[in-house]
A protein has these predicted regions:
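N-terminal subdomain of nucleotide-sugar transferases
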Residues: 1-66, 182, 265, 270
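A conserved catalytic-core segment of Leloir-type glycosyltransferases
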Residues: 2-3, 40-105
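Acceptor-binding helix/loop patch of EC 2.4 sugar-transfer enzymes
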Residues: 12, 72-84, 101-105, 129-170
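Donor nucleotide-sugar binding/catalytic pocket of nucleotide-sugar-dependent glycosyltransferases
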Residues: 43, 143, 163-235
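An aromatic- and histidine-rich active-site surface loop
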Residues: 83-94, 109-130, 136-146
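Acidic donor-binding loop of glycosyltransferase active sites
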Residues: 181, 307-310, 321-339
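Conserved donor-binding/catalytic core segment of Leloir-type glycosyltransferases
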Residues: 230-252, 259
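Nucleotide-activated donor-binding/catalytic signature segment of Leloir-type glycosyltransferases, i.e.
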Residues: 275-284, 290-314
Length: 339
């Protein structure tokens, strides 16, 4: 029997980290064995993540999955110098541990997923040193609207830091992308835009790999019998529509369309509109309880804020999943970004 091919998956974010970037490797790596690949995940030590950890999410990772962790520079040391990005803080540790693994063991491919983006630069460096082909995986564009039309300034406008980040991405992305043997992305538009920005990139293969879904998450949720009835009341005869996720400035026009439709429904059938409740969770993408509301102010513009509730702080993953399970309907909103 042919031995499985081996892939080193580099993902700075991984459970118990609770950020959105943790799910790409979490969902992908456990299923690679079904397709003839034996994965090893290289990630960051939980002590070096910022924000709250999600131990329940960590419990959902299959025990058979090999996970190697390395230290990153502590944020308390680097932030006074303006560096908080996990990819930068962990770059040295990821390089050191990846080099150690590639020296001692055989790997047939390297899979680096971004965000954060800077670890993508490990691809060309490790390929040059060890001759291992690498795949660059995009969860989001490296060079997108951040620093161009949106940023960390007031009202979500671009500021100096977001513009600097975009400038760095425009200079660094070609170095990584041109060396990539394969390019994958959550959408075809994402990798096509990246290749369009870098005409000299000639990957041997490209593929669209949506974030996807794992039935095991629902089975895990049911086994734990988690309930969030205080967040989504049941048996009250109301129509509970839930949105769980970040609400970016580029998504506000979509939300305005939703609120305008709810306002119009109130004009046409006030009794039906009175039964509708829109619930928003995690809109700020921050863990802190003091994060500012983003959905309620928009609802107020259309006079439907009495039908809207919002919890800006992020929920733990399985809490958010239970909230979606408890909902009458789930609201999925995109943004104005073409990818």
């Amino acid at each position: 029997m042919k031995p499985p091919r081996r892939v080193l998956v580099v993902s700075p974010h991984f459970p118990p980290d609770s950020s959105a970037g943790t799910h790409r490797a979490r969902l992908l790596a456990p299923h690679l064995g079904e397709h003839g690949w034996e994965p090893t995940v290289l990630t960051v030590d939980p002590r070096d993540y910022e924000g709250a950890l999600d131990p329940v999410l960590a419990e959902s990772v299959p025990a058979a999955l090999r996970v190697i962790r390395t230290r990153a520079w502590p944020a308390r040391v680097t932030r006074p110098f303006g560096v908080g990005d996990l990819g930068l803080r962990a770059f040295e540790g990821l390089w050191r541990e990846a080099s150690h693994l590639l020296t001692r063991e055989r790997f047939d491919a390297l899979f680096i997923t971004i965000y954060p983006a800077y670890p993508a630069l490990l691809g060309p460096l490790l390929k040059r040193r060890f001759g291992v082909p690498f795949v660059l995986d995009y969860q989001d564009p490296w060079v997108g609207e951040w620093g161009h039309s949106v940023g960390g300034g007031s009202n979500g406008r671009p500021d100096v830091r977001s513009r600097a980040s975009r400038f760095a991405g425009m200079r660094l992305e070609p170095f990584a992308l041109r060396a990539a043997d394969g390019v994958t992305a959550v959408s075809e538009a994402t990798y096509r835009q990246a290749l369009g920005r870098n005409n000299h990139a000639r990957p041997a293969a490209v593929a669209e790999l949506p974030i996807g879904w794992d039935d095991g998450d629902i089975a895990f949720l049911r086994a734990r019998r988690q309930r969030l009835s205080p967040l989504i009341p049941g048996g009250d005869g109301l129509i509970h529509i839930v949105y769980a996720g970040t609400l970016l400035p580029t998504g506000l026009e979509t939300l305005r369309a939703v609120c305008a439709a709810l306002g119009r429904l109130r004009e046409l059938d006030s009794a039906l509109a009175g039964r509708v409740r829109l619930h928003f969770f995690g809109t700020s993408n921050q863990r802190s309880a003091g994060a500012a509301s983003r959905a309620v102010p928009v609802a107020r513009e259309f006079g439907v804020d009495d039908l809207v509730t919002e919890q800006p702080a992020r929920l733990d993953y399985f809490d958010a999943l239970q909230t979606l399970v408890d909902a009458t309907a789930v609201l999925l909103m995109g943004s104005s970004e073409p990818h």
